[in-house]
């Protein structure tokens, strides 16, 4: 949760005031991102409006969604919950904000993750940009390999052509001490690059 709070702090506060804001977490798990966002939204909107109109949840894990329903009181509020593969997700909505800690490799029929050669980050970001409003924002945490200038890496071009408002390099490692990967997280505005990037941390 501390890592999520740090990330959400970089989202422009005034945008939380918009009552028409629609926020999607496409791999919501048990709702860590939306727990933090919900608390911020309570400064400006009532609970019913937030839960029934502003927050949108999606995941492919039924058990996690059942826990999420209890956390966000699905017995009292009509939550926006879908159980879909995000890559084929289509609710006919353009979102102002999409937050995500995406899976790094495809889930195989045996329940295991595929090798790193089946990295899903690129296709998740491509999908995100398709359903993100122009001028909307995405907040992602991913391994740092998207920053490589390797010939096959097209993701660095896709992301740097957009306006990265904040890029955090490797400092999130303190929250994932038992995980081998090095992480970046970033806040991106869905507009062409127009100003300098705020960078925190060091690329090694």
Where are these regions (language model features)?
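Flexible, glycine-/basic-rich loop-and-beta segments that form/coincide
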Residues: 178-204
């Amino acid at each position: 949760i501390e890592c999520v709070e740090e990330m959400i702090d970089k989202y422009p506060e005034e945008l939380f005031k918009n009552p028409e804001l629609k926020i999607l977490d496409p791999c919501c798990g048990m709702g860590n991102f939306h727990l933090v966002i919900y608390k911020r939204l309570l400064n400006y909107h009532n609970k019913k409006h937030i839960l029934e109109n502003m927050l949108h949840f999606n995941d492919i894990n039924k058990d996690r969604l059942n826990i999420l329903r209890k956390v966000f009181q699905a017995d009292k509020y009509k939550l926006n919950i879908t159980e879909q593969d995000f890559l084929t997700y289509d609710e006919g909505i353009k979102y102002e904000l999409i937050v995500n800690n995406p899976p790094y490799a495809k889930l195989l029929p045996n329940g295991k993750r595929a090798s790193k050669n089946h990295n899903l980050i690129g296709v998740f970001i491509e999908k995100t940009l398709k359903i993100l409003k122009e001028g909307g924002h995405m907040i992602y945490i991913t391994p740092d390999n998207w920053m490589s200038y390797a010939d096959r890496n097209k993701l660095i071009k896709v992301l740097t052509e957009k306006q990265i408002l904040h890029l955090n390099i490797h400092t999130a490692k303190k929250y994932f001490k038992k995980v081998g990967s090095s992480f970046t997280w970033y806040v991106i505005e869905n507009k062409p690059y127009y100003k300098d990037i705020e960078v925190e941390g060091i690329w090694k």
